[in-house]
């Protein structure tokens, strides 16, 4: 909720030396409270004053209440205007940094859709709303160069047949690299074109079915 996480495997000593990060904050469930609710409780008490929070997360489709799953953690962070960033590995476990989102920081289409869902569920807070960008789905427009490339590759019609959310997420993610890293942009564009040729959608674009297409 877009701010790209750093690669995993960074040496703990090197990271601490570079950014003077404190020991990761361990949030553990109490009184049989699920880890997600424990994280939300911490945010309710500390989001307005804390500068960062390090928590252990588990990637993949949430399958139990014994872990703080990445998707759940990101959703709770969005509710309070926080965002995930750096990730490190400690003893084989992924530790993720959350911190308050800066005003006017870029928003991915995926995080926007997550917020829409959280609003419908009544989970968003005023703190989370204060940092929101324009949230209308029509506020997003596919980059003209990307549209031209898809048309030249004769996959534009196929691309437009995909769910609207998938279109927005893929278009944003590819265009994100356009000025930042032209080489990565070309690789991402080629990947999108090849997948679209066979009408194949790739990546976890809807949070394992949580988000509307």
Residue ranges, per PLM feature:
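Charge-dense, helix-prone N-terminal extensions
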Residues: 2-213
């Amino acid at each position: 909720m877009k701010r790209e996480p750093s690669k995993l495997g960074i040496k703990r000593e090197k990271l601490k030396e570079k950014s003077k990060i404190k020991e990761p904050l361990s949030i553990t469930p109490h009184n049989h409270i699920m880890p997600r609710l424990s994280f939300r409780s911490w945010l309710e008490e500390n989001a307005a004053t804390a500068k960062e929070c390090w928590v252990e997360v588990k990637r993949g489709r949430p399958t139990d209440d014994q872990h703080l799953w990445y998707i759940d953690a990101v959703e709770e962070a969005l509710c309070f205007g926080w965002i995930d960033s750096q990730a490190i590995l400690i003893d084989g476990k992924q530790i993720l940094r959350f911190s308050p989102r800066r005003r006017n920081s870029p928003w991915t289409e995926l995080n926007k859709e997550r917020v829409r869902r959280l609003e419908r569920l009544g989970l968003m807070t005023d703190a989370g709303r204060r940092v929101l960008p324009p949230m209308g789905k029509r506020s997003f427009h596919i980059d003209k160069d990307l549209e031209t490339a898809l048309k030249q590759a004769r996959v534009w019609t196929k691309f437009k047949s995909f769910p609207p959310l998938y279109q927005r997420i893929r278009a944003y993610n590819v265009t994100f690299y356009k000025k930042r890293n032209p080489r990565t942009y070309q690789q991402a564009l080629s990947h999108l074109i090849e997948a679209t040729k066979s009408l194949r959608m790739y990546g976890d674009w809807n949070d394992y079915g949580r988000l509307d297409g």
